[in-house]
């Protein structure tokens, strides 16, 4: 199981195929996505990679957080997240994951925070049908109607679908196809819509319900930056070259 990446949503556009068909795509940008630390089964009880992306000022950053980035010898990051991986998919601390970590044609799962829509009624929030347009209904055409019974049960049950705040939820969209990658600019173009607004942070992983392509690099495509911990040749997995460039 490979690591995912932290990307930033740029917006939507379209690309054309050789046959002239256009494909709607969402542009995701990798902003110096680097490895900050390892989580091992011996110390933490599970195996994972801690990644960071984006730039952050240290003016109001607590010393404890600054110390974590100093230990990893990485510039402070705006967004930090963990990705579960297998033991043979660990990437050196400080390495920067590149856009060709994903190959064209493979499927990915994306997770983001949906756009906030404020206080919404039952018809918009839960797709209720509303009340009748005529025959005695006045003003309350878009209301949800009764929310409970009579004397029995004599109450409104918990979790009843009602008007309220809509959006700003953690949403995962499965099986989006990678249409194109741009290593120089750090761009990943995926087919379809991605949850969240422009500038929002998106977690991109290999699809769990689709097979991983054989040409996908393992443990990933990365480059060692600065004083990153290089993989020893004796300890490196069989599919991990101990070079400056990742697999």
Curated annotation (Swiss-Prot):
Modified residues annotated as N5-methylglutamine in this record: 151
Give UniProt keywords alphabetically.
Answer: Methylation, Ribonucleoprotein, Ribosomal protein, RNA-binding, rRNA-binding
One cellular-component annotation, GO? cytosolic large ribosomal subunit
Q: Name one GO biological process term.
A: translation
Q: Where is this region: Disordered?
A: 140-164, 212-247
User: One Pfam family this chain carries?
Assistant: Ribosomal_L3
Q: Where is the composition biased (Basic and acidic residues)?
A: 232-247
- Highest taxon in the source lineage: Bacteria
Q: Name one GO molecular function term.
A: rRNA binding
Q: Which InterPro entries match?
A: Ribosomal_uL3 (IPR000597), Ribosomal_uL3_bac/org-type (IPR019927), Ribosomal_uL3_CS (IPR019926), Transl_B-barrel_sf (IPR009000)
**Record PTM:** Methylated by PrmB.
Subunit details for this protein? Part of the 50S ribosomal subunit. Forms a cluster with proteins L14 and L19.
Matching NCBIfam families, A to Z? Answer: L3_bact
Family of the protein in this entry: Belongs to the universal ribosomal protein uL3 family.
Q: What does this protein do?
A: One of the primary rRNA binding proteins, it binds directly near the 3'-end of the 23S rRNA, where it nucleates assembly of the 50S subunit.
* Protein's name in the database: Large ribosomal subunit protein uL3
This protein's species is Nitrobacter winogradskyi (strain ATCC 25391 / DSM 10237 / CIP 104748 / NCIMB 11846 / Nb-255)
